[in-house]
Amino acid sequence: MKISLSQFKRFEKQIILKKIGLAGQRRIFSANVLIVGLGGLGCPLLTYLTSSGVGRIGIIDYDKVEISNLNRQTLFYPKDVGKFKVYQAKKIINKINKKIKIIPFKKKITS
């Protein structure tokens, strides 16, 4: 996979790390991750994975955004209250990095 100049500029601080380099950044671009739950940990995890360039991220959650979520689920805004987390998260994340493929699953996970 060839890294474009704009991608190089965006991810340069990761690429210059000896443990990552160009080869490592290419692996990040082609990585697949699944996040189960968009709560207090899932939201920042999604943001950081997106910002680092992970290429494909699945997100699973069944809940809607509630007003009580906003203090710890920093991905969401008051205007998102009442909407399903997975669909709002996809819209927000696509604004951060349009090259990331977000796959929302509105599913309830049970044991």
Model-predicted segments: where are they?
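Adenine nucleotide-associated cytosolic modules
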Residues: 1-111
